[in-house]
Amino acid sequence: MAKNSRSQWIAKNLQRLLNVGLIALAAILVVFLIKETFHLGKVLFVNNQDASSYMLIEGIVIYFLYFEFIALIVKYFESGYHFPLRYFIYIGITAIIRLIIVDHENPIDTLIYSGSILLLVVTLYLANTERLKRE
């Protein structure tokens, strides 16, 4: 019994440490989200249209990445200390879309990235079927 209670004590304290770390990470991500908001505001008023539109689109996608990570942390606490798989898939899709927007010079790479997005969408569909859905 003593060994079991010690294991529970260790698990409980590690969970607390993880929670504190995630709260700190969420605070850092909120700061970056605010910085990105100001950056997007600056890009909107730049005169160079070609560079400005690409920077704006890239900034918006980065903004969504920060937003998705914060939403993932919120969902972790709401769902009883569990990270839902579909949020990681959303983040992966958004990150690959950002990569396509930023680095679209090689058509083969773009095709491979698009195939990766298709694979993630199929995975998301399978993860949301009634057999595999938890929530």
UniProtKB/Swiss-Prot annotation:
InterPro entries: P_starv_induced_PsiE, P_starv_induced_PsiE-like. It is found in: Cell inner membrane. Keywords: Cell inner membrane, Cell membrane, Membrane, Transmembrane, Transmembrane helix. Coiled coil: none annotated. It is a multi-pass membrane protein. One of its GO terms (cellular component) is plasma membrane. The chain crosses the membrane at residues 20-40, 54-74, 82-102, 107-127. GO terms for biological process: cellular response to phosphate starvation. Its main location: membrane. Belongs to the PsiE family. This is Protein PsiE homolog. It comes from Yersinia enterocolitica serotype O:8 / biotype 1B (strain NCTC 13174 / 8081). The lineage of its organism: Bacteria, Pseudomonadati, Pseudomonadota, Gammaproteobacteria, Enterobacterales. The gene is psiE.
